[in-house]
Amino acid sequence: MPDYTYLSDVAGYPRRIVCLTEETTETIYLLGEQDRIVGISGYTARPPEARLKPKVSAFTTAKFEKIMAVDPDLVLTFSDLQADIARELIVRGVPVIAFNQRSVPEILEMMVTLARVLGCEAKGREIVGRLTADIQRIACSANFFPYRPRVFFEEWKQPLISGIRWAEELIEAAGGEPVFPELRGGRLAKDRTVEPALVRERNPDVVIASWCGMKVNKESIRNRPGWDRITAVQKGHIYEIKSTYILQPGPAALTEGVRQLHAILARVCGVPVQPEIQPSEACDPDLHKSSPGRQMSTEELKI
């Protein structure tokens, strides 16, 4: 009979983790397990100290020799976009977990699942509970808006791509109404393309742009043919949220991302933002200009 006594010495949880996207890195830091991370994506920005970890990949490409050199016992990937990377790592004998979260509930589920994999599920559920409560607090604050601004969320400029599901869901939580709700289910960018003329027809009150890896050129948005007839352009309500805060399906979107969305929509409505839900990181500088419209009192904003 084979001797399996050696199995008692096998570590129960992964200790050398490579994260090929930003959201798993940030989640592991929130869990306080950052010492287990031995490799990250070059796009990682949060938290800043994570940038000191070895960089072993971009998004759709990876340095396999660098990954193998850090001797991982687990690699975390995201979606079909990293399927080729995952396949090669599996061929090389590396354990891989691929997440595929595309909505706010799925992001929360990803965080709990990752915590479970690391052996700290209770901490993960505690974090998810706090994030959920914060989003609910923002949604309650948005109930005091005089109206819900109609929002075109622009994920890319050419072709125009409307917001992915989690961004659209966070817009709703923050107090807005997406003008292309029927497209949010498109898992691929090509499934969410829109014609500029259709944006004119939907006539959003605000344009919120987040171009992945590129600074938004507001002047180019204002100068699109016929867009001078759009309410958002006429009233100067064109804003940027850095893709780091809203286009990664993880903690950043559920914290800073939704707070910046709420701050933008509050400005459009002409109301102040409660101190406890103010964005904590760099926002669009246009948000700091004097805001037109009626200012709601502190008493009106109490929830």
Where are the language model's segments positioned?
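N-terminal ligand-binding lobe of clamshell/alpha-beta domains
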Residues: M1-I303
